[in-house]
Amino acid sequence: MLAVIRIRGRTGLKPAAKKTTELLNLNRINHLVIVRETPDFMGMLNTAKDYLTWGELDKETLELLLEKRALMVGRKKLDSENIKELGFSSISEMADSIMSGKMLKDFKNLVPVIRLNPPRGGYESILKPYKEKGSSGYRGKDINNLIRRMLVPGVDLNGKNEN
């Protein structure tokens, strides 16, 4: 499974890239979706490669994403009661199901887009590809480090500090 994050906004967006980001439901900066690694999705990602970054998601990072940021319809946090409604006993079991190919949009009442904070320490240059010490494009397993930097602890979903 691939994690795809939008890193640039709407201004100056090429029409093909705009259509691709709409199809992926990536309508805002720092939003994340999880997609399968198929030729169709790879073609879409290459079309919008200047505005997105993506890579292979590992199970530990996926569990962290589900625990901290996944939302049910109505902005309800994903808790043990909601997980049981979806037919799983734990977040780990749900993460296994997603890693085996099930998409977030396949789950009833689960929001398919995960909202993240900007990364701690900021992005590298968003205008350059990852291979040239930038942020856009394919980054492989390093996407997990970026996601962990974007899961800032201490901030509630409503934007208020827990302290």
Swiss-Prot record:
Entry keyword annotation includes Disulfide bond: no
Leader peptide range in chain numbering: none
Any single Pfam family the record assigns to this protein: Ribosomal_L30
Classification via Gene3D superfamilies: 1.10.15.30, Ribosomal protein L30, ferredoxin-like fold domain
Any one of the GO BP annotations: translation
Alphabetical keyword list: Ribonucleoprotein, Ribosomal protein
GO cellular component terms listed in the entry, alphabetical order: cytosolic large ribosomal subunit
Subunit structure of this chain's protein: Part of the 50S ribosomal subunit.
Record protein name field: Large ribosomal subunit protein uL30
